[in-house]
Amino acid sequence: MNQSENQIDQILKRGVAEVIVEEDFKKLLLSGRKLRLKEGFDPSSPDIHLGHMVALRKLRQLQDLGHQVVLIVGDWTAQIGDPSGASVTRPMLSAEQVKANAKTYLEQFFKIVDKDKTEVRWQSEWYGNFKLEDVVRLSSKFTVAQMLARDDFAKRYAAGKPISVTELLYPMLQAYDSVMVKSDVEFGGTDQKFNLLVGRELQEMVGQKPQQVLMVPILVGTDGVHKMSKSLGNYIGVAEDPSEIFGKCMSIPDELILQYFELVTDIPDQEIADFKAQMENGQVNPMILKKRLASELLTQLYNATAAQEADARFTRVVQRGEIPEDMPECRLENGQNTGVIDFIILSGLAKSKSEARRLLEQGAVEINSEKISDQNTPVKCGDIIKAGKRRYSKAI
């Protein structure tokens, strides 16, 4: 491997919040040694979104320089739930839920990361045979005071909110993963800093060289306020339909455009700087930049054709208000009329009754191009239902 310092500097600077220890990591990258790059995922949810993609792109960039990704599927820790950034204890998942989520997760992971340069490891390989004495031995290396030094634990403790013993174990279990795979570098968001540093400590305790740590920024979701999260509904999933990805990109606040370009695309820095100047001077319509962002993303996740088709569909359906020819169809149960709320859920236009009612209250539901506000309005065969700006379904 013969990488230039400029290449490495670019990888370590753009879309990176902090590197520990940067000079040591840079020396490792210049050494020519094939590094083991650890990324862990708890499949507590089956989908990967752009927030995850920020770190995955870093992995891919380093894979392209010849390094090896080691993906840890947290089939054990997912049953606990990572407490990072959590204000309450998270519910535990069943082993069956975790396995089902992991299957989907892996399929989406390899939309971004090179499968041929990835080693997939499951925590159950080492935790499956763990005994109580092993847990005691591992936990004895750390103190409760160290765990309570975590910002999120400290806040919950001060507020009198519960912190389960399993949550206190979580950082140690994640750290032990690093020991088992002999990680050279671990990747994560800035909210993972405590866990990542515990990994360094434990490796030193057992005589391994401490892993370097690369942290990426937290991507703000489409609401412009909170961290991107499926539970908050402010996410863009990497496996969503191209038209859905395109439409969601168009909905992000203008002030997030440049951050998204930097973190999830390969647009050159100078071009992003030009976009910033043009926006500040009112020389460009933000919608044009959002379309460029959506196209860049779809080309990465799908291909250029999918990007072009999604762009054309957005222009027809959203900007011109045309009814799409390729809308999904939904069969009415027993061919009988059904209430609009039930149809919206049945067709997948909304995921819950509360979401469907909210769309009605916002005046965002139409039947055959007429706005509907009464939740008892019936839907019959042949009706075309629109929910939101770009979702359609035909009753058959």
Swiss-Prot record:
Keyword Cytoplasm in record: yes
Subcellular location: Cytoplasm
GO cellular component: cytosol
NCBIfam families in UniProt: tyrS
Organism classification: Bacteria, Bacillati, Chloroflexota, Dehalococcoidia, Dehalococcoidales
PANTHER family found in the cross-reference section: TYROSINE--TRNA LIGASE, TYROSYL-TRNA SYNTHETASE
Pfam families: SYY_C-terminal, tRNA-synt_1b
S4 RNA-binding domain span: 338-396
Protein's UniProt name: Tyrosine--tRNA ligase
InterPro entries: aa-tRNA-synth_I_CS, aa-tRNA-synth_Ic, Rossmann-like_a/b/a_fold, S4_RNA-bd, S4_RNA-bd_sf, SYY-like_C, Tyr-tRNA-ligase, Tyr-tRNA-ligase_bac-type
BP term (GO), one: tyrosyl-tRNA aminoacylation
